[in-house]
């Protein structure tokens, strides 16, 4: 197995310097796009140290951990940690596009990180390792990224991610025909799991490829695939890179995953590896589940309408501390 790096992006939306910088550009966001760029997108829960603790405890085999930020670093972070590499936006995004306050341009350029391995796993900072993982959870023995997927319609929510998925699929389907995608996609491999197979059966006779189901779990990616798509779609990805705030015309990181699926250059992963959860449903049962080891990965997603944010935040931190009480070597 080749070296595997982890890449994670992070922003401290409470940082007054960052907030002042963002305020200089807020006027450029039209009213129709303001909800797409709400405070929720930048909220810092104080749980990021547990992301690092999870990596050290549950993935000690990782080669390097690249933390991508906009001239920020957590106060508790040990920048001299052996496996840690800090990456500033200026190292991967052209100066004419900076500053950016959207994940889309950042994620579209992570392959430019100096020294990044060909095989890497991209994490959002709400994707936590909660039980031991192995390299083979992310890549096959011959180096293909592992995914679970299904044919699934894209949901066009006004302030959701559907616009990005449509833009991603528009690119993918311009290079791969419906029949090629059905042949390459491995949608009916038993390892996909019954639920995914049934979903794909429902949509396989559609005239067009309706979209791929998205798990919202970490993304195993190949640097060479990102290079290839940039070579083919430089204009589109260049526009996303110049998108200071989230814009309905953006692509996102799923494009690179979808390309692997459409081309057949992926292996089917474990459908029970992890799951997406939302903090608006947090309660005793959820916090117990977090500590149960049932899932190796849990994406714990922030939402707009949490009723008692302070209470949920305290319970969130307490549950993570219970799971990962010991400092990691990434901490001072």
Curated annotation (Swiss-Prot):
Gene it is expressed from: wcwK
GO molecular function, one term: transferase activity, transferring phosphorus-containing groups
Keyword Transferase: yes
Comment field (misc): Stealth proteins are part of a protein family that is conserved from bacteria to higher eukaryotes. Family members were first identified in microbes as proteins that help pathogens to elude the host innate immune system. Microbial stealth proteins are involved in the biosynthesis of exopolysaccharides. Stealth proteins are predicted to function as hexose-1-phosphoryltransferases.
Family designation: Belongs to the stealth family.
Listed InterPro entries: Stealth (IPR047141), Stealth_CR1 (IPR031358), Stealth_CR2 (IPR021520), Stealth_CR3 (IPR031357)
UniProt EC number: 2.7.-.-
PANTHER family, A to Z: N-ACETYLGLUCOSAMINE-1-PHOSPHOTRANSFERASE SUBUNITS ALPHA_BETA, PTHR24045
Coiled coil: none
Name used for this protein in its record: Capsular polysaccharide phosphotransferase WcwK
EC primary class: transferase
An example Gene Ontology biological process: polysaccharide biosynthetic process
Keyword Transferase: yes
Keyword tags: Exopolysaccharide synthesis, Transferase
């Amino acid at each position: 197995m080749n070296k595997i790096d982890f890449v994670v992006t992070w922003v401290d939306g409470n940082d007054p310097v960052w907030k002042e910088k963002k305020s200089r550009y807020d006027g450029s966001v039209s009213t129709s796009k303001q909800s797409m760029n709400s405070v929720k997108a930048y909220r810092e829960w104080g749980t990021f140290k547990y992301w690092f603790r999870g990596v050290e405890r549950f993935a000690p085999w990782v080669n390097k951990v690249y933390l991508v930020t906009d001239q920020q670093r957590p106060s508790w972070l040990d920048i001299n940690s052996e496996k840690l590499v800090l990456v500033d936006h200026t190292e991967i995004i052209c100066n004419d596009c900076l500053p950016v306050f959207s994940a889309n341009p950042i994620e579209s350029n992570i392959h430019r990180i100096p020294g990044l391995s060909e095989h890497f796993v991209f994490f959002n900072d709400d994707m936590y390792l909660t039980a031991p993982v192995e390299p083979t959870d992310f890549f096959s023995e011959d180096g293909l990224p592992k995914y679970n997927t299904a044919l699934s319609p894209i949901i066009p929510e006004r302030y959701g991610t559907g616009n990005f998925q449509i833009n991603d699929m528009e690119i993918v389907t311009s290079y791969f025909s419906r029949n090629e995608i059905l042949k390459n996609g491995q949608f009916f491999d038993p390892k996909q799991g019954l639920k995914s197979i049934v979903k794909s059966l429902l949509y396989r006779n559609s005239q067009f490829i309706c979209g791929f189901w998205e798990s919202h779990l970490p993304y195993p990616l190949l640097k060479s695939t990102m290079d290839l798509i940039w070579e083919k779609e430089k204009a589109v990805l260049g526009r996303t890179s110049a998108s200071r705030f989230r814009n309905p015309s953006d692509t996102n990181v799923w494009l690179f995953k979808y390309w692997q699926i459409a081309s057949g250059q992926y292996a089917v992963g474990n459908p029970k590896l992890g799951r997406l959860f939302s903090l608006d449903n947090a309660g005793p049962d959820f916090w117990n589940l977090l500590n149960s080891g049932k899932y190796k990965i849990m994406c714990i997603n922030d939402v707009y309408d949490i009723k008692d944010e302070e209470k949920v935040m305290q319970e969130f931190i307490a549950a993570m501390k219970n799971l990962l009480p010991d400092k990691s070597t990434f901490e001072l």
